[in-house]
Curated annotation (Swiss-Prot):
Residues 122-126 are lumenal. This is Protein CURVATURE THYLAKOID 1B, chloroplastic. Pfam families: CAAD. Its main location: plastid. The keyword Ubl conjugation does not apply. Disruption phenotype: No effect on growth behavior, leaf coloration, grana stacks or photochemical efficiency of photosystem II. Curt1a, curt1b, curt1c and curt1d quadruple mutant shows disorganized thylakoids with extended stretches of unstacked membranes and broader stacks made up of fewer layers. Determines thylakoid architecture by inducing membrane curvature. One of its GO terms (molecular function) is DNA binding. Residues 1-20 are annotated as: Disordered.
């Protein structure tokens, strides 16, 4: 009569492990390690967890509703917050725009260009000698601009007039 036995433990065979002293006659046989089996998951445990979650949901729902005989709270005063003037102006300007798709596309392109230029500046800043040279160029240009446009009163007034006229050209005379 033949009998069949099934082992429920897992076995790992490590062929690189050195043979143990207690190994049988053949020294080249691989080492075997047995691992314990995992405990069997009971279905009642999952059912208990589901029931507990349903109980929590039921409690949350009952807490969200009003009690019997209790009237819901109503406010007699309507609380309104005024929008800042710049938001109102922006909303009015957006309503006047005919081609909103083009404006949205330009805004998206501007964000992408800003992101790309920030990456390019970051890459240039990592170069060894370039940041120091660019800083010197910036200091020199700032000094030249200050001397040419801001030191003397007639030059300063001419600069202010040029800025105001450019501002009117961009936004239109209103």
């Amino acid at each position: 009569m033949a009998s069949l036995s099934v082992s429920s433990s897992s076995t790992i065979i490590d062929s690189r492990a050195p043979p143990s002293r207690l190994a049988s006659a053949s020294a080249s046989s691989p080492s075997c390690i047995s691992l314990p089996t995992l405990p069997i998951q009971s279905h009642t445990r999952a059912a208990k967890a589901t029931a507990y979650c349903r109980k929590i949901v039921r409690n949350v729902v009952t807490r969200a509703t009003t009690e019997v005989g209790e009237a819901p709270a109503t406010t007699t005063e309507a609380e309104t917050t005024e929008l800042p003037e710049i938001v109102k102006t922006a909303q009015e300007a957006w309503e006047k725009v005919d081609d909103k798709y083009a404006i949205g596309s330009l805004a998206f392109a501007g964000v992408v260009a800003l992101w790309g230029s920030a990456g390019m500046i970051s890459a240039i800043d990592r170069l060894p000698l370039v940041p120091g040279v660019l800083e010197l160029v910036g200091i020199g240009y700032t000094g030249w601009f200050t001397y040419k446009n801001l030191v003397f009163k007639p030059d300063r007034e001419a600069l202010f007039e040029k800025v105001k006229s450019t501002y009117k050209d961009i936004l239109g005379s209103s």
